[in-house]
């Protein structure tokens, strides 16, 4: 036990895209095996060498390379550096904290960034928002939050059988992913005040070219590709 370490009894952990990458190790995220994945978890403090956390505290950790270079949440107990932990708000249970998990945290950051655009541009209203990778965790929660903000949300998916699901979440329009997998124009027609992109690659390049002047893009994923072929023209 090192100075500042905290031992946590894990209650819940979520399953994320990065966990799949870690299991495959195609992205070379793990240096050696055996390894315990799980990039987030919630639980109770069982032992603490930190003045910030005491026995019985409910805590949450997300990302911070947990489950990557540090042992992850798919375990009964985890020893973690205290600076990576946050105390769980009392308004949410440990279970619900991980139902939202890293995907929920990420989608909220994206949604709040788009909402903040209205304040940055002196109240100019955001209307049309595009969400790619819409049936994934980040995309699904982003649709719910953005629609609650009153935005006209367009969801991008390659799964035609998920149209009803996306409409229930709050999407007003559905776009076939293939429409954004074509060679992007340098400057397309301005369609979007905001974009939440979880895909990357050519889909993000097309979303950039279709974003209105003064628009905002929250790019948070690379499910399709880490590469981005674009120009300075849309900026």
Question: Could you describe each region identified by the protein language model?
Answer:
Residues 139-148, 212:
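Surface-exposed amphipathic alpha-helices with a cationic face
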Residues 57-58, 77, 148, 216:
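Residue-level marker of beta-strand positions
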Residues 202-235:
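Glycine-rich phosphate-binding loop and adjacent beta-alpha segment
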Residues 62-130:
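NAD(P)H dinucleotide-binding glycine-rich loop of Rossmann-like/cofactor-binding domains
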Residues 104-105, 133-140, 200:
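Glycine-rich NAD(P) Rossmann-fold beta1-alpha1 loop
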Residues 147-203:
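Adenosine-nucleotide cofactor-binding segment
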Residues 60, 193-196, 218:
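N-terminal Rossmann-like NAD(P) cofactor-binding module of classical short-chain dehydrogenase/reductase
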Residues 1-14, 26-66:
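Glycine-rich beta-strand-centered segment in the early N-terminal region that forms part
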């Amino acid at each position: 036990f090192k100075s500042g370490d905290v031992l946590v009894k894990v209650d819940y952990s979520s399953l994320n895209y990065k966990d799949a990458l870690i299991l495959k190790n195609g992205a070379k995220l793990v240096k050696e095996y055996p390894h315990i994945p799980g990039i987030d978890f919630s639980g109770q403090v069982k032992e603490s060498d930190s003045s910030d956390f005491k026995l019985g505290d409910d805590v949450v950790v997300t990302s911070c390379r947990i489950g990557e270079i540090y042992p992850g949440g798919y375990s009964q107990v985890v020893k973690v550096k205290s600076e990576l932990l946050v105390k769980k708000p009392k308004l949410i249970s440990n279970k619900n904290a991980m139902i939202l998990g890293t995907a929920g945290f990420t989608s909220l950051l994206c949604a709040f960034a788009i909402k903040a655009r209205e304040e940055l541009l002196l109240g100019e209203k955001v209307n049309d928002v595009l969400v790619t990778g819409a049936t994934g965790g980040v995309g699904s929660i982003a649709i719910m939050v953005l629609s609650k903000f009153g935005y006209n949300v367009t969801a991008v998916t390659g799964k035609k059988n998920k149209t009803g699901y996306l409409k229930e979440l709050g999407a007003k329009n559905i776009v076939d992913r293939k429409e954004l997998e074509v060679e992007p124009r340098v400057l397309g027609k301005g369609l979007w005040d905001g974009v939440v992109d979880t895909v990357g690659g050519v889909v993000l390049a097309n979303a950039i070219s279709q974003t209105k002047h003064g628009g905002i893009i929250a790019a948070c994923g690379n499910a399709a590709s880490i590469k981005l072929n674009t120009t300075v023209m849309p900026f």
